[in-house]
């Protein structure tokens, strides 16, 4: 089985990369999820980055 690439989820407010996920080759657009940012101290929108 091929190695799966990991991508990071970055906070849209402070830019810190708090979460990592495995890349899904079937998904064409970038993932956007509401997650808790420990640096901002609140739930913010996190976007997929490379």
Curated annotation (Swiss-Prot):
The keyword Ribonucleoprotein applies. The keyword Ribosomal protein applies. InterPro entries: Ribosomal_bL33, Ribosomal_bL33_sf, Ribosomal_zn-bd. GO terms for molecular function: structural constituent of ribosome. One of its GO terms (cellular component) is ribosome. One of its GO terms (biological process) is translation. It holds the Pfam family Ribosomal_L33. Gene3D superfamilies: Ribosomal protein L33. Keywords: Ribonucleoprotein, Ribosomal protein. Belongs to the bacterial ribosomal protein bL33 family. HAMAP family: Ribosomal_bL33 (MF_00294). This is Large ribosomal subunit protein bL33B.
């Amino acid at each position: 089985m091929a190695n799966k690439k990991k991508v990071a989820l970055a906070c849209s407010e402070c830019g810190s990369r708090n979460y990592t996920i495995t890349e899904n080759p079937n998904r064409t657009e970038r993932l956007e999820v509401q997650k808790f940012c420990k640096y901002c101290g609140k739930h913010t929108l996190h976007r997929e980055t490379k």
